[in-house]
A protein has these predicted regions:
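Solvent-exposed loop/turn segments at secondary-structure junctions
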Residues: 66-69, 99-101, 140, 241-243, ...
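Carboxylate/His-rich catalytic cores and anion/metal-binding grooves
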Residues: 1, 100, 106-109, 119-124, ...
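Hydrophobic faces of well-ordered beta-strands that scaffold small-molecule active sites
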Residues: 61-63, 90-97, 127-136, 181-183, ...
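Catalytic pocket of metal/acid-base enzymes, prominently hydrolases
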Residues: 1-94, 123-175
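His/Asp/Glu-enriched, well-ordered alpha-helical/loop segment
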Residues: 44, 172-182, 189-212, 216-217, ...
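Acidic (Asp/Glu)-rich catalytic clusters
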Residues: 82-87, 117-127, 205-207, 228-232
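Conserved short loop/turn motifs at secondary-structure junctions
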Residues: 57, 62-71, 96-100, 185-189, ...
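Distinct, well-ordered alpha-helical segments
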Residues: 75-77, 106-113, 191-204
Length: 378
């Protein structure tokens, strides 16, 4: 189990007296959680998750934190077994994460070599692709994202998940190896660090179609959105943040000017930045229709519509859970739209999401899915 010595070894994020481990402190906890991969236990959890995917019309999922519990090979094999036994069928893209390798003391080169070994385990439906996940700042739900000036109005500060030298070293290693980079980034100070990193990588080793993706995108400035577009970045956003958090953030954290502007997707869409919408389940419901609704309506928990200039169009939101999401994963030639030569994977809905009243968008029923050309009714 976790000991007091484990907690004391963590500079920030572990309080033994309170039994509180968060952000960087989880590095002391996750390596001790191998029991989660006990076949019966893990299999039950995966069956529940796959059932949620089917109910929501999701045919492909991306795990952006493979290895976070410290036993990546066991994790990959467990996911493979669960997907292989699923009667409906799904596709799962597994993405290695920087914190796994740092916790285990691996160098960037050792991490790359290990990921190549994992790729030998790939199957048609479960694969470790040429993607790598970076971590920049803390979580938005805990108020530990890094916000630029004037920062949090109550005076507290966020956390950096990885120092700049390590962030740069791992990013450079995988960028040069031809991997697509994804970076967990929530606050606008973290967005600035993402932009600086992308500028550095492009200057050192230019690429035309790099698709480096900012993940989560809780808060950014208009100037930063302009810069993301100019650099050819993509954004995979969680629009649910605006619905569930913007009212609270509009108080003594960000204030009434910044809080309602969380998740500025309308600005990105107008600038032509490729956008995907994700749930980061269970941070948001595993429901593409709910994600569409939050991006299009921009209501908060009280039902107020705020930051309306940052609404996405319905077509833009639909693309963000289909073809544009596939593009961000580098899978646009095989999934994401119904076209000759692609896998016949799609959801069957009770109503057209482009024509129902906005307040009914998230209530559309998922009748079933078609996976690899075979229909399955919910």
């Amino acid at each position: 189990g976790v000991t007091e010595a484990d907690a004391d070894a963590i500079e920030e994020g572990a309080n033994w007296e309170r039994g509180h481990f968060y952000e960087l402190g989880l590095r002391a906890v996750f390596p001790k959680m191998g029991f989660l991969f006990e076949p019966t236990r893990y299999g039950r959890g995966m069956r529940n998750f796959l059932a949620m995917m089917h109910e929501s019309g999701v045919t492909t999922a991306a795990d952006m934190g493979t290895g976070i519990f410290g036993n990546p090979v066991a994790e990959i094999k467990a996911v493979r077994a669960a997907v292989a036994s699923d009667p409906v069928g799904v596709r799962v893209l597994l993405t290695p994460i920087i914190t796994d390798f740092m916790t285990r003391g691996q160098s960037p080169q050792e991490a790359l070599d290990e990921v190549r070994e994992w790729q030998a385990l790939n199957t048609e439906r479960v694969a470790v692709g040429n993607h790598f996940k970076l971590m920049i700042d803390g979580a938005i739900f805990s108020g530990l994202s890094q916000m630029g000036a004037p920062g949090y109005l109550d005076g507290h500060s966020g956390v950096w998940m990885v120092d700049v030298p390590n962030l740069t070293a791992f990013a450079e290693q995988f960028w040069d190896a031809g991997f697509q980079l994804h970076a967990h980034s929530n606050g606008d100070a973290a967005t600035a660090r993402f932009i600086e990193l992308l500028e550095y990588l492009l200057a050192k080793n230019p690429k035309r179609d790099h698709r480096m993706t900012l993940e989560h995108f809780a808060y950014s400035t208009e100037d930063q959105n302009r810069k993301l577009a100019a650099l050819g970045a993509a954004v995979s956003a969680n629009p649910y943040y605006h619905y569930i958090l913007s009212e609270m953030y509009s108080g003594d954290w960000l204030g009434p000017d910044r809080g309602p502007q969380m998740v500025r997707l309308g600005s990105l869409e107008k600038k032509g930045v490729p956008i995907g919408l994700h749930s980061d389940s269970p941070m948001a419901p595993l429901s593409p229709l709910t994600l569409m609704w939050t991006a299009v309506a921009r209501e908060n928990l009280s039902g107020e519509r705020t930051g309306q200039a940052e609404r996405m169009t319905r077509m833009g939101a639909l693309k963000a859970v289909t073809i544009d999401a596939a593009w961000i994963l580098g899978l646009e030639n095989s999934i994401g739209s119904i076209r000759a030569g692609k896998a016949a994977d799609f959801a069957i809905l009770s109503h057209d999401p482009l024509s129902v009243p906005i307040n009914q968008l998230r209530s559309i029923k998922v009748v079933g899915t078609v996976f690899a050309g075979i229909a399955h009714q919910n």
